[in-house]
Each structure stands twice: as C-alpha cells, then as structure tokens.
C-alpha cells in the first residue's frame, strides 16, 4: 500500500482498464484513495468517435466498480493538467500506460517526475496505446 492518493491517467481506450486495476492495487483496497483522469487537448471532443465514447463510458463504469471517481479534462498542457489533478488530490502515485516496445519519444513520465519529485510515477505496459 502507498501513502497518499493514487491517480490513474487513461486514454479513450478500453485497454486502460488494466491501468485502473493496477491503481486499485496500489491503494491496498483503501476506499476513497483512487482517482482516474482523462485529458483531451483543447478543441478536441471527449467523445471523438463512437469507439472512444464507448470506451470512456466503459472506463467510467470500471472506475465506479473500484470505488474511484473519474474526471474528464480539456487542456493544451496535458502534463500541467495531470500535475494540477495530482496536487489537488494529494497524490502519492501516478499510474500511466506505456506502449510495448520503443518508448524513447514519450516525454510525459519524465516531465511528471520532474514536476512532482515526491510522487511515484508508474508506467504499466499496455497493448493498443
């Protein structure tokens, strides 16, 4: 079990269920310590397609099943939005998806670690992201 709150960052894909499940494990089953966030860039619709709409609806249900709240946000600064959400909930752990294979182009985990040095950032290998 970890100290503080656990924040899970999801995309509009059903495979993010694995991230929510992993986040729930970090809480050790403690109620009220899990939040899920999806950040869409400003100008993009949250429900950009039927697939994404269905996936986000599914992830809302999965979040509820784990006793988590789920927030949808718009921001041109995805990292900044996640940092704000993490500070707001006194986050101790952030859970992110990481694609299988080459991750050299991904900057978000490093940016989060730099801006939130006291928060553990965990990357979970997912398929389809």
List the predicted regions and their residue ranges.
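Small/aliphatic-rich secondary-structure junction motif
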Residues: 1-53, 62-64
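A short acidic, amphipathic alpha-helical/loop segment
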Residues: 21-23, 82-85, 108-111
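General small-molecule cofactor/ligand-binding pocket signal
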Residues: 35-37, 69-74, 122-124
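Structural beta-alpha unit
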Residues: 64-93
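Gly/Ser-rich helix-loop-strand patches that form or flank binding pockets
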Residues: 93-129
């Amino acid at each position: 079990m970890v100290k503080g709150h656990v924040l899970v960052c999801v995309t509009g894909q059903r495979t993010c269920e694995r991230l929510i499940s992993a986040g729930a494990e970090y809480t050790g089953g403690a109620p009220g310590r899990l939040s899920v966030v999806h950040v869409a860039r400003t100008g993009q619709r949250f429900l950009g397609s039927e697939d994404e709409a269905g996936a986000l609806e599914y992830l809302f249900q999965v979040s509820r099943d784990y006793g988590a709240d789920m927030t949808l946000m718009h921001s041109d600064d995805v990292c900044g939005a996640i940092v704000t959400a993490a500070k707001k909930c006194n986050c101790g752990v952030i859970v992110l998806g990481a694609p299988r294979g080459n991750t050299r182009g991904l900057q978000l985990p490093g940016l989060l670690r730099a801006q939130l040095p006291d928060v553990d950032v965990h990357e979970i290998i997912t398929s389809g992201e």
